[in-house]
Amino acid sequence: MRRFSRADRDSVRQWLGGWRGLGATAGCAALATWACFSPAPAADPATASQPLWTSAVVTRDTPTRSVPFDVDLGGATSVWLVVDDGGDGFGCDWADWVDPVFKGSGVEKALVDLDWKRASAEWGEVRKGKNAEGGELKVDGKAVARGIGTHANSVIEVAVPAGATRLVGRVGLDDGGANQGLGSVRFAIHTKAPVIRPKRAQAGGPVAPADGPAMLVVPEELEATLFAAEPLLSSPSDIDVDASGRVWVCEVTNYRGRKDTRPDGDRILVLEDTDGDGVADASKVFYQGRDVDSALGICVIGDGPGRKVIVSCAPDVFVFHDDDGDLVADRKESLFTKTGDPQHDHSVHAFSVGPDGRWYFNFGNTGHAVHDSQGKPIVDRMGNVVNDGGQPYRQGMVFRCNPDGTDFEVLGHNFRNNYEVAVDSYGTLWQSDNDDDGNQGVRINFVMEGGNYGYVDEHTGQGWQVPRTNLEAEVPKRHWHLNDPGVVPNLLQTGAGSPTGICVYEGSLLPERFRGSLIHCDAGPNVVRAYHVKADGAGYAAAAENVADGAADRWFRPSDVCVAPDGSLLVADWYDPGVGGHGMGDVEKGRIYRIAPQGSAWSVPKHDFSTVTGAIAALASPNLSTRATALERLAKEPEAAATALAAALGRPADSRHAARLAWALGGLPGKAAATVKRLLDAPDANHRIVALRLARMADIDPLGAMEKLAVDPDAAVRREVAVALRGVAGVRADAVWAKLAEAHVAGDRWDTEALGIAAQGPGNTSLWDGRLAAWLAITGDGWKTPAGREVVWRSRGGLSPKLICDLLADPQVGTSESLALIRSLDFQDKAAASVAIRDLVTNIDAPDEKLQVILPELVMRIDPAGGTEGKLAERIAAAAAAVPGTQSFVDIVQRFRLQSRAADLVDLAAADGTTDAVAVSAIA
C-alpha cells in the first residue's frame, strides 16, 4: 500500500472534484482534526459514470451493519470502489470492504492481495487489514480477517485480474465510526473513473449568519445573539476578549491541506462593536504572517499602549507588543521555540494569566518538549528536562511560568490532547482532554499539580489497549488507565467528542447555577456545556448542562469561549461542515455568538487603569483579560497598591473576588508573609488553599504552612498540603506526610493520588522510603485497614513489595482487591518485587478460588533465573492448570519451560476455537 505522492494529487482532485482536505493523516483531537465525530452536509455521489452497483445507506441500524455484493464486471479492466457519506456529512464514516474477491472461470483472487493503482480517503488512510485509523477491522463487533478499511469519501482504483468476471464480497460500517454513535456510508462500484462533485448543503447547515442564533438551543433563561460573522472574520480557532470588549481572533485559513490558501499568511484580528449595539462592526488586522499560520491560541494583556498579545503557533510561542496602543503589532518576541509539531492541533495551545500573575498553558501529545527563545531545552523547578521521553513526563502536559518564561513548572502530564487550561481565582486548574477517536472517553480534568493522567502506561509508555492486570471493564475508563496506581481520576467523562476551548465562569450576569462553573466547547457534537463543580472529598464532582446545542446546525463548531466584561459569554464558531483528519471543508465562514440572559443588552464597563484604585476595582471583573491588565498595573506601584489592597481585602463578600485581592496583595514585594498569615486561619477552605499556594509561590515558610494545615478538617485543604510536599525532603516533611496518610479516608481516590504526588522527589527521584517509615511508625496495624491498604497500594518505596505481598496473603483481602494490589507490583522495583512475590507464592495459604485467580498473575512476575524448585514449582504448575487454553497458560509454560506441558501447547495450537494469536504464540 502506498500513500499519494505529490504528483498524484492533481489526479485525486480530478476524481473528487471540489472535495477538500485530501491526504489527511489519522489521529484527531480538536479543531479540524476533531474526532471524526459529528455528521455534517458534504458531498453527493453525483458521478460522470453510472455505478455498476450501489448499496443502500449503511448505518448503525442496518442489520449486521453490512450488506453483500456480487457484481458482474462486464469485461471491465479496472474498477473503482467508492464510499460516500450517504448525504449527511462525513463525520464518523469509517467504512470497510470485507473480503472482496475477484472471481471467474479458474480465477479467484482476493483484492487485498493485489496492489491498487490509487486510493484516497477523506480522513485517515486506506489500509489493508486495518481500519482508517490503523486499528483492527471490525464490523458489528466481529473481526474482519481480510478486508480494506477506509473513510468516506473514498475512492480505490484496482486493475481487474485477467479472467475475472465478477467481484464478490461485503461492505460495512466499521466499528471505529459506529461505536461513536454515528456514521452512515454508501458504497458503489464503477468501471469508469467517477467524478464526485460537491453538493449543495442539506438541512443541518450551513445557514445564513442571521439565522444562526435561532439554530442554537440554549437554556430558557438565556438567548444567543450574533456578535460577528463572515465577511468580518472566518474560521476562528481561538479568541480572547479584552477589557474594552474587543474580540481578538486567531483567524485560520492556511490549515494543513489548505496551507497556501492565503499567501500573505493567517491573521490576528481585532473585532469591535463601535456603536454599542452588541454586534461587531469593525475589524482590524493586528498582525498577519506565515509565522502565525494555524495559530491555536491567543491571550491579551493590557488595554492600551504597552499591550502584550501571546500567540501560540507551534512550534513557537510569540509575544507581540503593541507599544503605542493602536491595535497593530509593533514588535515580536519569541518566548518558547521548538514546542510542538507545526500545523498540528495536539501541539501548543493558548496561554492564560492566573490570579497570581503567572502564565499557564499546555500542549497535547505532539508538543513533545519546550525550548527557550534560543532553542535550549527547558529544565523545570523539579530539575527535570521538559520533554515527553518518560523521564518522568509523557505525552501532553500543563505548564506554569513567569511572564519571562523563568521558574518553569510542569503541573501535570500524560494527556492526549488537553486543548486549553483554565485557571480559577483560587489558582485551581481545569481542562479537557480528547480520547483516541471512537472510544467514548472525552474527559474533564481537575489538574492536581504533579499528577499523571494516564493516557499511556506511566512506566512502559504502552497504550491503553495493551492487556494488563486489573483491566478496567469499560473502554472509556480503560483508555486512561484509571485502575492503575499513580493515575489521577477524571472529574467527568463526557463520551465521544472533540473538546476545544474552556473557561471558568466567575461573573454574575448568568443565572446563579453557572457561577464558578466550567464553560466548555465540544466541536464534534456541536455543543457548549457548563460543568457545575462541587467539592467531593479531596477532589471534585461535576454535572453537565448544555449552554448552546447546535443540533439544528451541524456546521456549528464551537472552538473557544470567553467571558466578556459584562459577564456574558462569547463563543467562537469555526463553522465547518465536518471535523476530522486535519480536514477543513470551508475557509470563508466563521461566527462569534453572544450568550446572555434574555433581553440583556451588551455593555462594556469602563475601568480606569491609570490609577491604583481603578485597577483594584478591575479585579472584580468577570473578564480574565481585564483582571490580568489590573494585576500588571498594580505591580507598577507596589507601595500604593499594597495599602489599598489590604483595605479592600476585608470588604468583598464574594469568595472568588477576595481570593483575587489576596493574590494581588501577596504578590507584591514584602507582602506575602502577612497575607499568608491572614489567610491560614480564614473560615473559607478555598482561602486556606490560596494561603498555601501563595506561601509556596513566594517561598514564605511553605513547610510551616503545611504543618499547620496538615490537620485541617477539610479534605481538599489536606490534599493541597500533600501536593505542596512534592519535592520537599526531610524529617519534617515526612512527618507531615504521615499525618496526611493517617487521615486518609478509604475510597477517596483524589486523596490517594495526592499522597502519591507528595512522595515525588526532585530530579525524578523518590521520597517514598522516608514517607512510609514515618507513617508506619505511627499507624501500627493501620496499614492493614481499608484506608491503609490504599496507601500501600499507591506506595513505591523499598518496603512496598513486601507490604503489598503481605496484604495479598491477608484473608481479609478479597480477589478483586488482590488484582489491584498485584497491578501495583508492576510499579515497584522489579528485583525487590520478584523476591517478595517468590516468597508469597511459595508460602501463601488461601482458598482455592482466590489462588486460581491470583497465582497465574503472580508467577508471571517471578524471575525464573532465581530457581523454581520445591513448593514454588508446585505453585507454578497449579498456576498453569488454572488457566488452560489461554494466552496466560502459554506464557507460564514458556516462561518456566514446563516440559511436562509442551505437548499441551501443540494441542492448543491445533484446537478448534483457539484464537490465531494464542495459536501462533503457543508454537513460537
Residue ranges and their predicted role:
Residues 195-614, 635-636:
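Beta-propeller domains with acidic blade repeats across secreted/periplasmic ectodomains
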Residues 69, 156-158, 213-214, 236-237, ...:
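Generic recognition of flexible, low-complexity loop/linker segments
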Residues 43-204:
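Gly-Asp-aromatic-enriched flexible segments
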Residues 23-35:
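Bacterial N-terminal signal peptides
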Residues 33-47:
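Bacterial Sec-dependent signal peptides at the C-terminal "C-region" and cleavage site
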Residues 572, 588, 595-924:
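Long, ordered, helix-rich scaffold segments
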Residues 1-18:
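N-terminal secretory signal peptides that target proteins for export/translocation
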